[in-house]
Amino acid sequence: MDETVLWQLSYGMYAIGAKHGAEDKGCIVNTIVQITAENPIIAVSMNKDNYTYEVIRESGQFAVSILGEEVDNNVIAELGFSSGRTKEKFKLFAAGHTKEGLPIVEQGAVGYLTCEVLQMVDAETHAVILARVVDAQKGDAKTPMTYAYYHEVKGGRTPKNASVFSSDELEADAKAKSEAPAAAGSGGAKKMRVGWKCPICGYIEYADELPPDY
């Protein structure tokens, strides 16, 4: 089977926020689908190893921040590449809360959904969470970020718990980026690009010197 065909499916980038007592918990997912229009129901794919999955299973509710193309890379780095078992990730960037007290990404999101769990369907490594959308509000961003934009423009990589994770894809992408030369200069000589890669989220900043706030 040619599993690369599955890469042609379209995905987004979403921050999930949940509450564990007084603590804010969350993660990044890329697979959310609207199932019904009237009294809207959505389906969320989430790895069962995620601590956020445990929190949602216990609390029965969560918020979705639909991330925009402008969102700070630190948001994805913290929510997507670290565990909420030992820290409150929403304290590490500009975050807000829904009227129900659920954590959301306050800056760089197209909109927010407040959801109540209806059912959790087992899907081997993952669970499909069917949830009722009980509230929806617009955010400050204009264009929702696609999974392709995250990889191709922001230079991001895939968390190992994502539903579309592929180690082969990541290795090929990293090799291509490291070997990619800049446009030919005078005399036809190729000049190598200098890039600084974040070890957490995989974002690559192309610059001769590392920015002071990187």
How would you name each of these model-derived features?
Residues M1-R193, E205:
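Basic, polyanion-binding surface patches
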Residues C198-C201, Y214:
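Short cysteine-rich clusters marking metal-coordination/redox-active sites
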Residues A207-Y214:
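Short linker/helix segments within small regulatory modules
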